[in-house]
Amino acid sequence: MTQIDNRFRRLSQALDYAFQKPELLRQALTHRSYSSANNERFEFVGDSILNYTVARMLYDQFPQLTEGELSRLRANLVNQNTLAEIAHELKLGDYLYLGEGELKSGGFNRPSILADALEATFAAVSFDADFAAAEQVVRRLYNQRVATIDTTRQAKDAKTRLQEALQARKLALPKYRILSQSGEAHEQWFKVECDLGEMALISTGDGGSRRAAEQQAAEAALTLLEQKLAASKKRS
């Protein structure tokens, strides 16, 4: 077993896939700050593999949903936050090759870098074997997530569900405010606040775009709202 094989042994076990050419996995985990032989082109292919596979899983799982509803479900499953969550589960950050600047700034834990590396990993599997092998890796990582989707909650995005929940109770609509914005133009990171003034509730969300951060903040606000309403109901 070569040194590179040994470095990726645990990751291969987590993916349930053994690379014949581990150098492909290494490139998938190499950020552009580390080398010109990086994962950007891999990410392009991996994104397509991911989107097709998740779309097919949703199509088979939910025959009753419309194209628009399936699209919203897929968007929630393939967004940066979900990909970063899966990458954390795989401990992908432990295997990244990053330049000195990215290392110092915590790039191994940055959602955008983790999400890109995971997509690039799907591409690496397809280059090492074929599309079917990459599809199986995606399916193994997403089976539980797809199986446990609550379509009554997920068919609409979080901002829409929050707005409808407030309107149903004749409450004021939420106010969103950017708390911080960092990173270079091509890799920005937003922190957003969601203020439910009448309910005295404030939540926050992070994301690679303002929209993604607002969606995460809205999801958190929904949870807080449900908890407060449930507590109020118990007291009455």
UniProtKB/Swiss-Prot annotation:
The keyword rRNA-binding applies. Its cofactor is Mg(2+). Residues 157-227 form the DRBM domain. Keywords: Cytoplasm, Endonuclease, Hydrolase, Magnesium, Metal-binding, mRNA processing, Nuclease, RNA-binding, rRNA processing, rRNA-binding, tRNA processing. One of its GO terms (cellular component) is cytoplasm. Its EC number is 3.1.26.3. SUPFAM superfamilies: dsRNA-binding domain-like, RNase III domain-like. The active site is at residues 47, 119. It is found in: Cytoplasm. It catalyses: Endonucleolytic cleavage to 5'-phosphomonoester. Its main location: cytoplasm. Pfam families: dsrm, Ribonucleas_3_3. Mg(2+) binds at residues 43, 116, 119. Residues 8-130 form the RNase III domain. GO terms for biological process: mRNA processing; regulation of gene expression; rRNA processing; tRNA processing. It is an enzyme of class 3 (hydrolase). Homodimer. Digests double-stranded RNA. Involved in the processing of primary rRNA transcript to yield the immediate precursors to the large and small rRNAs (23S and 16S). Processes some mRNAs, and tRNAs when they are encoded in the rRNA operon. Processes pre-crRNA and tracrRNA of type II CRISPR loci if present in the organism. Belongs to the ribonuclease III family. HAMAP family: RNase_III. This is Ribonuclease 3.
